[in-house]
Curated annotation (Swiss-Prot):
Sequence repeats: 28-56, 57-85, 86-114, 115-143, 144-172, 173-201, 204-231
Protein name: Allergen Ani s 10
Stretches the record annotates as Disordered: 107-126, 134-231
Region (6 X 29 AA tandem repeats of [EG]-G-P-G-P-V-[IV]-[SG]-G-S-G-I-G-[ND]-V-W-[NE]-K-A-N-E-[QP]-A-[AE]-[QEH]-Q-[EQ]-[NS]-I): 28-201
Keyword Repeat on entry: yes
Organism: Anisakis simplex
Temperature dependence comment: Resistant to heat.
Record's compositionally biased regions (Low complexity): 114-123, 143-152, 177-187
Keyword terms: Allergen, Repeat, Signal
Stretch forming the signal peptide: 1-19
Upper lineage: Eukaryota, Metazoa, Ecdysozoa, Nematoda, Chromadorea
């Protein structure tokens, strides 16, 4: 009787092992995927089947404050060919991601038809997020600097006054863009003390600031220059 029970358990174990799928590379790494409404376990189907990872539609690429790491084996192999993404909204990451979706990249110019250097970006796509904002995006998103203000669910008409003078206000250097899920929040203590002069923004919002290598009180010198540029 015990022998029969043992054989049954052994057969069940063999069946479980042989029927289990080979685990694929999941989205992970040092930086989280950023989205306004949250993305969670982003693409179950994509993580399960590597071959279908490139069938993901949507207007925007994956975003991470400090990079996602090796997102997908195949996409991350040829480093020299990873960055050929068209459209105004590039793949944004502190350490870069690479050529993520072949199909999405072929149609990137259409998918990313948002004016300005700071596009709407989302891991699984947002759609036409701001009807009014997109119509006037060239004026609203005219922000200079190495990284655009990015939000998973969009920022909308971010700072009326600030965007009019964005070229002077946002001339901030550094390794990574300012990224927020649904706003910017309490950015830099020192900078926020002078925010009324520098950016005319109300400090607050639910989304923390993220950057490729962290921000903290990041660039004192550029913040000092921002105040002088507004003078």
């Amino acid at each position: 009787m015990h022998l029969i029970t043992a054989l049954v358990l052994l057969l069940q174990l063999i069946h479980f092992i042989t029927s289990s799928p080979i685990p694929q590379e999941v989205v992970g790494g040092p930086g989280p995927v950023v989205g306004g409404s949250g993305i969670g376990n982003v693409w179950e189907k994509a993580n399960e089947q590597a071959a279908e990872q490139q069938n993901i539609g949507g207007p925007g690429p994956v975003i991470s404050g400090s990079g996602i790491g090796d997102v997908w084996n195949k996409a991350n192999e040829p480093a020299e060919q990873q960055e050929n993404i068209g459209g105004p909204g590039p793949v944004v990451s502190g350490s870069g991601i690479g050529n993520v979706w072949e199909k999405a990249n072929e149609q990137a110019a259409h998918q990313q038809s948002i004016e300005g250097p700071g596009p709407v970006v989302s891991g699984s796509g947002i759609g036409n997020v701001w009807e009014k904002a997109n119509e006037q995006a060239a004026h609203q998103q005219s922000i200079e600097g190495p990284g655009p203000v990015v939000s998973g669910s969009g920022i909308g008409d971010v700072w009326n006054k600030a965007n009019e003078q964005a070229a002077e206000q946002q001339n901030i250097g550094g390794p990574g863009p300012v990224i927020s899920g649904s706003g910017i929040g309490n950015v830099w203590e020192k900078a926020n003390e002078q925010a009324a002069e520098q950016q005319n923004i109300g400090v607050g919002g639910p989304g923390p600031v993220k950057s490729g290598s962290g921000i903290g009180n990041v660039w004192e010198e550029t913040n000092e220059e921002a105040a002088s540029m507004q003078a």
